[in-house]
Structure formats: C-alpha cells, structure tokens
Swiss-Prot record:
Gene Ontology terms for molecular function: DNA-binding transcription factor activity, RNA polymerase II-specific; RNA polymerase II cis-regulatory region sequence-specific DNA binding; zinc ion binding
Pfam families noted in UniProt: GATA
Biased composition (Basic residues): 279-291
Taxonomy of the source species: Eukaryota, Metazoa, Chordata, Craniata, Vertebrata
Protein's UniProt name: GATA-binding factor 1-A
Annotated organism of origin: Xenopus laevis (African clawed frog)
Cellular component terms (Gene Ontology): nucleus
Function: Transcription factor that acts synergistically with tal1/scl and lmo2 to specify embryonic dorsal mesoderm to a hematopoietic fate.
Length: 359
C-alpha cells in the first residue's frame, strides 16, 4: 500500500469543520514533520470522532519509518491540521468522551527525540514496531494494553478496567501426604477406598495384596540357619548354613553332611571350626581391583617369564634397523597390471520377453 507524503501547505479537504467525518471507517495517512530531512511517519486512527477540525483519536498509532539522525528536536508546521509550530510529540494526549489515556507510553518523547536507537532496532525492525503498537483493551474503557515481549516463565493477564497481574506458569499444587507412610513426594498419587491419598508404592501394595503396606521393612533372610534345640549328630554344632540328614535320618550340619556324601565316612571332629567357611564361586571384579591396589608393586614370580609385547622380536630404535629392501621381494600381484573388468551388457525387459539377446 503506497502512501504519499502530505506537506504542510496542502490541507486535506476531507476533514472539514462540519463534523461529518465517518466514525466507522479507519482513517490512515502519512504525514511529514515539516522538513526535508525529517522522517515521515505513518499514523492510523482507530476511530475518528471529529466534531471540529481534525482531532487525534484516543488511541493513536505512530510508526516511524526510520529513526531521526539528529539529536535536536524536530520542528513541525502543521497549521493545516490545527497544530501550531513547535516540537511535535510522538504521543499527544487527546481528551475524548471516553476519558483521558492513563497508560504511560512505552517510550518517552524526550528520550525518543534526543537519544539514538540501538543498532538492532533501526530501520523499522519488527521488534521495534511490535513494541510501539498499542491496542484498546475494550471500547468501554480507555486503558491501553501494550504489546511488549514478556518473559516466557511469567504469564501476564490483563483485565478490563484493571492492570496486569502476574501468574507463575508452574504453580505449586496442594500439599499431599500419604496416609500410610507419610510420604510427600511420589511419581504418582493414588487414592484408597475412602478417598485418602496414597503414594504410588502404598497404592500398588494395597491393590496387589489387599492390605496396607507395612511401614517396617522385613529383615533380610538369615544366612545362618538356627533351629531351637537342633544340633549336629556328628560335631554337635548348632550353627550352619544348611541342615542335612544322614542315612539314619539324624540332623547333621552342612559340612558333616557334604563330607559324608563325598567320602562315605563321618567327618572327623578335628576338622571342626568355630567360624563358617564359605567360598566365592565367582571372583568379582571388585576383589580383583582390591588385590591390585593392595600390592601395586608386587614383583613378578620367579621362574615365570612374561610374554614379550612385541611378538616379532626385540624393539629396535632408529639407526639400528638394517636395510631390508634386498631381503623382501614385492608380492607378485603388485607387479601385474590392473585388470579392467567389463560388465555384461544390460538386457532390457522387451528383449528378454521377445527372446532376443544383445550381440
């Protein structure tokens, strides 16, 4: 859409003193500020309620085409629009039937005229134009809702007739507590039959077993099996990892039962030990590392020769290696010229169907 710049000498005939301006259509124009070097500005009035001459709307949108290069004020001579000669304010305050504009401007006129814009927001960048836009919140009120960027973690909600109120996107839920174990943190909250909150563990336990989850953890299974009044009939011990029975049915400890099973004789009492000796069927990596850390400087065993890390012979340094060009003959396939493989011609579908083979 093209807009022509209106100078101060050509008054607009559409705006008369009769007050017949339309209130339904939006008026848009491009006006200059009186000088050749002055930037042009595009202004659009949301609703024109002109009774006399041209009057500014309560909501006036100003879109500067580029920032002023000078720091001095911009003189304007808009006598045709009912404006006296002077410094033009980019945010004029206009009185209307709806009341004065109480929302503060996004940028003050003094800082806009005297200060220079940052390089990232020059030449009508989208960020700058989006910041200058103002929209009416409601036709019944005069509050303006500035369209400025907000923080992604804070949501600002504007109410009609009131200011914005900040709400956090991550609001904390009500404090919940498991009625069984008293836990306050769980990946999933459940409910019992009466509607009370249960943590995920207590809820699953009650669902599977039909009873409340016990608060005291059960003790681990005892490694040493103890029976009241039970003794080995051979060594008379009452502590063992496994109780067995001999041929006559008498209880025996694990050691005596295994010894009799392997040798068919009773285990001698001289082999009895106070402690229970166990063996590790699989040596864990932790025990290996522990042994290596205990003896890091253990000398090698006598009579055991470690294999050489160089299987092709001792290591030779630079200058000690003899010339070996006359000893090694190049492989035979390196001397032959490379062969060029010719692929068979492709047979098309029509030739295969007709039975004609290519030459």
């Amino acid at each position: 859409m093209d807009y022509t710049t209106l100078t101060t000498q050509d008054p607009d005939p559409n705006y008369t003193e009769s007050g017949l301006a339309s209130t339904s259509e939006d008026s848009q124009f491009l006006y200059g500020l009186g000088g050749e070097s002055s930037p042009g500005h595009y202004g659009g009035a949301v609703s024109s309620r002109a009774v006399g001459g041209f009057r500014h709307s309560p909501v006036f949108q100003t879109f500067p085409l580029h920032w002023p290069e000078t720091s001095a004020g911009i003189p304007s001579n808009l006598t045709a629009y009912g404006r006296s000669t002077g410094t033009l304010s980019f945010y004029p305050s206009a009185a209307s039937a709806l009341g004065p504009i109480t929302s503060p401007p996004l940028y003050s006129a003094s800082s806009f005229l005297l200060g220079s814009a940052p390089p990232a927001e020059r030449e009508g960048s989208p960020k700058f134009l989006e910041t200058l836009k103002t929209e009416r919140a409601s036709p019944l009120t005069s509050d303006l809702l500035p369209l400025e960027p907000r923080s992604p973690s804070i949501l600002q909600v504007g109410y009609i007739g009131g200011g914005g109120q900040e709400f956090s996107l991550f609001q904390s839920t009500e404090d919940r507590e498991c009625v069984n174990c008293g836990a306050t943190v769980t990946p999933l909250w459940r409910r019992d039959m009466s509607g009370h909150y249960l943590c995920n563990a207590c809820g699953l336990y009650h669902k599977m077993n039909g009873q409340n989850r016990p608060l005291i953890r059960p003790k681990k299974r005892l490694i040493v099996s103890k029976r009241a009044g039970t003794q080995c009939s051979n060594c008379h011990t009452s502590t063992t990892t496994l109780w067995r029975r001999n041929a006559s049915g008498d209880p025996v400890c694990n050691a005596c039962g295994l010894y009799y099973k392997l040798h068919n004789v009773n285990r001698p009492l001289t082999m009895k030990k106070e402690g229970i000796q166990t063996r590790n069927r699989k040596v864990s990596s932790r025990s290996k590392k522990k042994k290596q850390l205990d003896n890091p400087f253990e000398p090698p065993k006598a009579g055991v020769e470690e294999p050489s890390p160089y299987p092709f012979g001792p290591l030779l340094f630079h200058g000690q290696m003899p010339p070996m060009g006359h000893m090694i003959n190049p492989p035979h396939h390196f001397l032959q010229s490379p062969r060029i493989s010719h692929s068979a011609p492709a047979v098309s579908y029509r030739q295969a169907a007709s039975g004609v083979t290519p030459p």
